[in-house]
Amino acid sequence: MRSNMIKKGPEQAPARSLLHATGQIKSPEDMNKPFIAICNSYIDIVPGHVHLRELADIAKEAIREAGGIPFEFNTIGVDDGIAMGHIGMRYSLPSREIIADAAETVINAHWFDGVFYIPNCDKITPGMLLAAVRTNVPAIFCSGGPMKAGLSATGKALTLSSMFEAVGAFKEGTLTKEDFLDMEQNACPTCGSCAGMFTANSMNCLMEVLGLALPFNGTALAVSKERRALIRESAFKLMDLVKRDIKPKDIVTKEAIDDAFALDMAMGGSTNTVLHTLALANEAGIDYDLERINEIAEKTPYLSKIAPSSSYSMHDVHTAGGVPAIINELMKREGILHPDRMTVTGDTLRDNNAAYTIQNEEVIHTLDNPYSEHGGLSMLHGNIAPLGGVIKVGGVDPSIQTFTGAAICFDSHDAAVAAIDNHTVRPGHVVVIRYEGPKGGPGMPEMLAPTSSIVGRGLGKEVALITDGRFSGATRGIAVGHISPEAAALGPIALIEDGDMVTIDLVHRTLNVDVTDDELKQRKARLQPFKAKVKSGYLARYTALVTSANTGGVMQIPEHLL
């Protein structure tokens, strides 16, 4: 056992004394059992995490029953919805790296034999995922689960995205104060991750197809008995993984990354999943070509349209068969998934999901009746985005296949929001928000406020937005993010000028500005070098080390320092 490093031999007597002092060692025999870390993320200010202390207690009890000794520790968490639209959002993506580093530190410092990860919301799941692959200790994930969908006084289904769009409608005068306050009180009725196919739920669903979590991890409600049963079952499965020495890198292969993107396409997941899955590939040492994502989109049908792209919530998906039913449906067509891969159950992806079928074909469509023959996400390339940009095509009105408009440029999120609110942005514009990438932001903040304001003002089909920042999973409309290289890295998005004609072509997956190469070269020669916005603290260190979105926005030490 790994943990023998801290508990065996006369040299470790001081360590054993300290271990006895924790209260977790109940008898001398416990020193012969596997030490299991519970990497929790309980925090009071994040509704998706307020109940995780209870779930960790269930996991600890089950681990003891299964013959292990549990030790719980906690990571930080940022609520993207609360941090939205101010400096707090600049800490959101960087928090992923802190979580990964913190988990790595505790796991490796104490030589745990296995790790039970309990994440839920946006950056916590991917942060723990990076730690799991980096430490490569037998591990399992069981998230906290989604919240119930809200319900307005008029009976309208609500999610957090409804609330963000309501802000624009209220400012526009098309929503009364009474209805606005009613929505505010009822949009988030329980604990759990937000009820739509936003980043948290997207990532927790992907954990199932990656093979690191049990079926229904992504959809069983936070408040359900099923969630608690899933925690218990996951604990017993983890102990089996420890005995069999099955590690995350045995499960996270290039084929697993492919399958994660395929499920993402089938469910129209958040664009943030692209960022996090590329970061996972990087951490696992997997060379992953971005063009592979479009190849997967070409062969993967869009089967389940979930809020904000429809009124269906994660609970609706769960009762319709959940992720297992979607996986089983995709397995019916040869070549979409790699169903014979190893998973944390010790069985294959096929074995885990073959028994589940679609229970409601309105919520989860069949292969014979997809929303689209192609996936809900696309990578775009062109002279604005030589290294790519991403759009959630499932959140774009199907009538829009191309959009050409005049650029209106902003060097910050706040300037763009002000221009949208004061009606400077008008139909036919392509809003360009730059210097908001990983380095430029810093922290690649989400552009949910401007996209929600555009949709809330009724301009969702008449105004497009492109950015080197990113979007919330709650974003919909003609919105291209993750443009790489970012402006702070002298990317071409920095060269666009007001009035330039920009074309977004969803059919050919291109993003171009109608400016000659010679003119772009001249503009680049005049471009001033980027100066870091933050000079001290964590964000200053992050700015110095972070890469653009095409590599997952990971932190890398310059080669000359290695």
Swiss-Prot record:
GO terms for biological process: isoleucine biosynthetic process; L-valine biosynthetic process. Pfam families: ILV_EDD_C, ILVD_EDD_N. It comes from Macrococcus caseolyticus (strain JCSC5402). [2Fe-2S] cluster binds at C121, C194. The keyword ATP-binding does not apply. Functions in the biosynthesis of branched-chain amino acids. Catalyzes the dehydration of (2R,3R)-2,3-dihydroxy-3-methylpentanoate (2,3-dihydroxy-3-methylvalerate) into 2-oxo-3-methylpentanoate (2-oxo-3-methylvalerate) and of (2R)-2,3-dihydroxy-3-methylbutanoate (2,3-dihydroxyisovalerate) into 2-oxo-3-methylbutanoate (2-oxoisovalerate), the penultimate precursor to L-isoleucine and L-valine, respectively. Pathway: Amino-acid biosynthesis; L-isoleucine biosynthesis; L-isoleucine from 2-oxobutanoate: step 3/4; Amino-acid biosynthesis; L-valine biosynthesis; L-valine from pyruvate: step 3/4. Belongs to the IlvD/Edd family. PANTHER family: D-XYLONATE DEHYDRATASE, D-XYLONATE DEHYDRATASE YAGF-RELATED. This is Dihydroxy-acid dehydratase. The modification N6-carboxylysine is found at K123. Its EC number is 4.2.1.9. Keywords: 2Fe-2S, Amino-acid biosynthesis, Branched-chain amino acid biosynthesis, Iron, Iron-sulfur, Lyase, Magnesium, Metal-binding. Its cofactor is [2Fe-2S] cluster; Mg(2+). Binds 1 [2Fe-2S] cluster per subunit. This cluster acts as a Lewis acid cofactor. Mg(2+) binds at D80, D122, K123, E446. GO terms for cellular component: cytosol. The active site is at S472.
